[in-house]
Amino acid sequence: IGEKVPAFRREAPAGGFRLAGAQGRKLVIYFYPRDNTPGCTTEALDFTRMKDDFAAAGTTVIGISKDSVKSHDKFCKKHGLGVILVSDEGSDVSERYGVWAEKSMYGKTYMGIDRTTVLVDKSGKVARVWPKVKVAGHADEVLAAAKAL
């Protein structure tokens, strides 16, 4: 908290996204494991539902996963999503933000994204981090924090 966020430029369905292009605005970066899975879909729909509220609070919302731009495009169209989804296929952005971690399922370990949200202030510094996010009510909590900045 209080540190400058790592800069990045990545592809997104509507074109590229550059972190530097968001300067002067608050930014919510939510890292999620995978498109079209129940928790990830709910989270994206919650942030989409509140998109206008975040905009009124001067805050841009972006989601980041390892999925391809093509996958993000299909995910957005299928669910009518209104948030920017950024592809991190090489996982280097996830690594720089410290959310690329060893996970386990059914006794097997693998590397993946820990569901995490980062709130960035207008100066590009980390204002708050939510690690190991539980989706229910999360977007509401993030909006309240963004409004309070």
Positions of the model-derived regions?
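Chalcogenol-based redox active-site neighborhoods
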Residues: I1-L149
